């Protein structure tokens, strides 16, 4: 009898334990369902926000110079933000890029294979330069070089000139000169066949002079190592604009660089993944020479009168683009024929800048400030 009672007691205990387990399971299921529902609501809200910002072409991500130390030589300059892109960035929403604070872009137009030496067009160049320009972003183009001599540099320049001739180019045409790991240029350097810094200068300047002959402004892109240990960047100052690459918060290049690639992992609205962040230093109202051989006899925009149609401007469709009149010797110049008009820092209240760049029989460029309320 005692054994039977013990057996019944054990059965009751088991039943109670089973009930407790079922109750806990129901509780866990309810908790899981609650969490799942909350996550679903959150995802829907995020999707709605993304849609709103996509439709409006607005990005909440803003390029900034936080954490960067600028050289004292630029104390009178405005810091303008930009990026550089290639086919590796895939599809780009350029309006969002502009609203992120990117006022200019260097777009890869082509490249020489580091293995075969063959010249190639960047798969997304034409699409990118059309859409970036339409979004109000100033465009320049670069060619990834592996030139071993002056003749190859000229070949690359002529290839680039053919690619850009049908587009409005407001920024320099750039030779991107760097040692690609295992590439033909690095192999020649390691073999001791390019021992003198003059050889590097001759190559990049051959490229620059060829594009300048067609009236374009030229530039040389290179990293700190190339500009310091293979070249003398100070020798390039009077020959070409320098676009220096150095990460870590500061640029120590001795040459008078105008552009600085300060990061390779920037987050920019409209681009999935990381992108290079570039800085452009501009001194307002200073007349910059384009160094273009084909424009030696042209009239400088510094000798022209540049006027706005109002004292201040309001944002319209997330940007301000004033009416600008440019005259020379009493004659009104035509935009597109005599000058190219661009705007930077014009997507929020403060001071924006109209950049007037000489075209045709006119040369040089100047950034003129205007007020945005």
Q: What is the meaning of each model-derived region?
A:
Residues 67, 75-206, 212-214:
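Substrate-binding cleft of extracellular glycoside hydrolase catalytic domains
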Residues 1-30:
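N-terminal Lys/Arg-rich, disordered targeting/topogenic segments
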Residues 22-44:
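N-terminal Sec-pathway targeting helices
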Residues 2-3, 67-91, 236-295:
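Functionally critical loop-and-helix segments that line ligand-binding/catalytic clefts
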Residues 370-373:
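Interdomain boundary/hinge segments at the C-termini of tandem beta-sandwich modules
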Residues 214-229:
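Aromatic-lined carbohydrate-recognition surfaces of secreted/lumenal glycan-active proteins
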Residues 295-331:
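Solvent-exposed, low-complexity, repeat-rich "mucin-like" stalks and linkers
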Residues 332-363:
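Serine/threonine-rich, repeat-prone extracellular segments and beta-strand-based repeat modules
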């Amino acid at each position: 009898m005692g054994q039977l009672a013990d057996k019944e007691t054990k059965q009751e205990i088991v039943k109670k334990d089973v009930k407790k387990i079922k109750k806990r399971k129901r509780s866990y299921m309810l908790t899981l369902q609650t969490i799942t529902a909350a996550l679903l609501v959150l995802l829907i809200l995020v999707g709605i926000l993304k849609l709103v910002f996509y439709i409006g072409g607005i990005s909440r991500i803003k390029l900034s110079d936080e954490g960067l130390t600028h050289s004292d030589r630029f104390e009178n300059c405005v810091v303008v933000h930009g990026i550089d892109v290639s086919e590796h960035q895939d599809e780009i929403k350029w309006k969002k890029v502009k609203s992120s604070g990117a006022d200019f872009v260097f777009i890869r137009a082509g490249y020489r294979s580091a293995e075969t030496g063959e010249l190639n067009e960047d798969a997304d160049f034409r699409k990118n330069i059309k859409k970036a320009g339409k979004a109000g972003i100033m465009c320049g183009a670069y060619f990834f070089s592996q030139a071993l001599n002056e003749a190859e540099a000229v070949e690359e320049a002529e290839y680039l000139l053919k690619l850009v001739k049908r587009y409005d180019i407001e920024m320099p045409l750039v030779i991107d000169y760097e040692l690609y790991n295992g590439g033909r240029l690095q192999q020649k350097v390691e073999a001791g066949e390019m021992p003198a810094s003059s050889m590097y200068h001759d190559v990049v300047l051959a490229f620059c002079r060829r594009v300048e002959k067609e009236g374009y402004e030229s530039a040389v892109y290179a990293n700190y190592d190339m500009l310091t240990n293979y070249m003398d960047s100070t020798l390039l100052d009077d020959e070409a604009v320098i676009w220096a690459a150095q990460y870590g918060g500061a640029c120590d290049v001795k040459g008078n660089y105008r552009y600085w690639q300060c990061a390779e992992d920037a987050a920019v609205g409209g681009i999935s993944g990381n992108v290079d962040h570039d800085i452009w230093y501009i001194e307002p109202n200073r007349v910059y020479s384009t160094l273009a051989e084909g424009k030696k006899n042209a009239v400088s925009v510094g000798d022209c009168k540049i006027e706005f149609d109002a004292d201040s401007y309001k944002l319209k469709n997330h940007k301000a683009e004033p009416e600008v009149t440019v005259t020379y010797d009493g004659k009104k110049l035509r935009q597109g024929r005599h000058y190219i008009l661009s705007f930077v820092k014009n997507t929020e209240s403060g001071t924006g800048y109209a950049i007037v760049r000489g075209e045709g029989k006119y040369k040089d460029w100047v950034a003129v400030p205007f007020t945005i309320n």
